[in-house]
Amino acid sequence: MENIVVNRLPAKTWYWLNVNEASFEWDSNASVELEKTIITSNAIEPVIVDIAGDNDYIEKYIDIIAEDNKEVLVYINSRADKHIAVHTNINAGNNSKVKLVLLNYTGMDALLYNEVKGECKENARVEAVEVFLGKGDVYSDFRIDLSGDKSSLKMDIGYVGRDKQTIDMNVFANHLGKKTESEINVNGTLKDAARKVFKGTIDFKRGASDSVGNEQENVLLLGDDIVNKTIPLILCAEENVVGNHGATIGELDDDTLFYFESRGIEKEAAENILARASIERLTRLIDDTKIVDDIEKELEEVL
């Protein structure tokens, strides 16, 4: 067994917060590597990649290549009953668009590591939707280099954490080109004794003038033993840029609870309605009806 370190912050903060990085145990000797998948913009239909297996440790590598002036839509459906590591690389050419939907389902005592890294050339765009549902631990590491002028990233994340589950997320928008844009939206619910870490970094490198980055997280807390850590980070080496971050974290307030109760909806049902909303808002960004149905079924089990 070896200790795999992931989700590193680009600029370290106080060590006692225990958020500079994350780690998990992995048995490389027992790991089975699945056949690599290469997806290009020549695909006429959306591409669905299903990842699962019976082995104790599984790794999967995926390349997504959008050529100049092309678009590609990819769904990555990862179902972990034991240990799965998925590594996705994105290459978005000039004026291209990549839409990526990441579905993370984990069974009890399972572990899923989802790593995405990529580069956007001039006027390229990556739109990503990531959904976290299940019972096991999930580590997600997402980094896009906005190298080309006017390139952009939009990231929407929804999660429900429960029992003693760990959800550790790291999103890094690396602004390199001029007039680049990033938008990171995270909405989630924590129940029972779930543990969640979200690290969102917007880094304006020298030369990224006239660029804009925004990140926002909303967290609903529905348990007494929850551990929630939200670390928004804006780094700036360029003067003429705009970076904003915000977070709303709290329990169901009395006014909202009264609104539901006055309509005959009890507290637990009201909490579940709001928890579902953090995921269901993302289904409006997903065109595949079967994928949406699968999400709804998972929600029924979780809530």
Predicted segment positions?
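Conserved beta-strand/loop scaffold segments within soluble protein domains that form the structured core
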Residues: W26-F258, S262-I265, I286, V292-L303
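Extended amphipathic alpha-helical segments enriched in small hydrophobics
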Residues: Y259-G264, A269-R281
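Short cationic/low-complexity microdomains
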Residues: V19, D27, A208-S209, K267, ...
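Long, low-complexity, mixed-charge
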Residues: M1-I44
